[in-house]
Amino acid sequence: MIAIFFSIAAVPAYAEEYSSQTEYTKAKDFVANINFDFFFSSSDLGEDVIADLKNIQDYITSHRDYTMDDLCDLVEPAKTRVNANHATKYDYSSLLPTSKDVLNAKEKEVFNSNPIYGLSVLLQASYANSQEKGRFGSNTWATNGDAFRHALWNALGTQFTSESYMRRFATAHETGSSDYDPNSIDTKMDLRNNATGRSLVKSMDLPSNPPNGMVIPYLISNNIATATKNGKLVRFVVAGVQYSTLRATNSATTN
């Protein structure tokens, strides 16, 4: 009994996030859903995230077996102090975070509680940003496109990490913002679309063994686009007019 006690005590805090799958299977499945070529060519991923991805790619190339804990150890924690110029490289008023450097204090706390999950959330943010731009173009604040992006990010994060982790990260993204106001319609819109994305993905019919790492994100994106078109999400800017109440979304291609 004593040996068992010490074995349990040595398990990292983030281990409880993982499913009941075997250590190796869970890690292999996790990596199989990362399309390294796609993310290496991303225009908005931070250099820190690219470096983490390269570490993972090198490690899995030279190691036959590895666990989620091994992958966690390959990801650099989010630093509490960063170069201010680097932190303002991207406009995060219209994009989701894709670098550890630009995360707020609450997001960094969640990221560091499970770095490999945190890295995945940033990767999913990059994918959601690109999908929104491809479908809706620019200037999407508070519109169909904005709603789509937040819901897609949360759906992807739930699928590839866990619902609880994605909920904590997305909530920290809102509540840790310097201009956070729980009563603002902007905050209410984001939190609601975040929650809807996490809920919708649980009922999606997704393949258990996709041929590559882009199949499931593509299917989830299409499902969220359909939900956007069918009014499952909310916005408060309609045809260029800003309203004081939330309105249902109505298109998967226009704002």
Sequence positions of predicted segments:
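Sec-dependent signal peptide cleavage junction
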Residues: 5-21
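Catalytic toxin/effector domains delivered as secreted proteins or via bacterial secretion systems
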Residues: 139-219
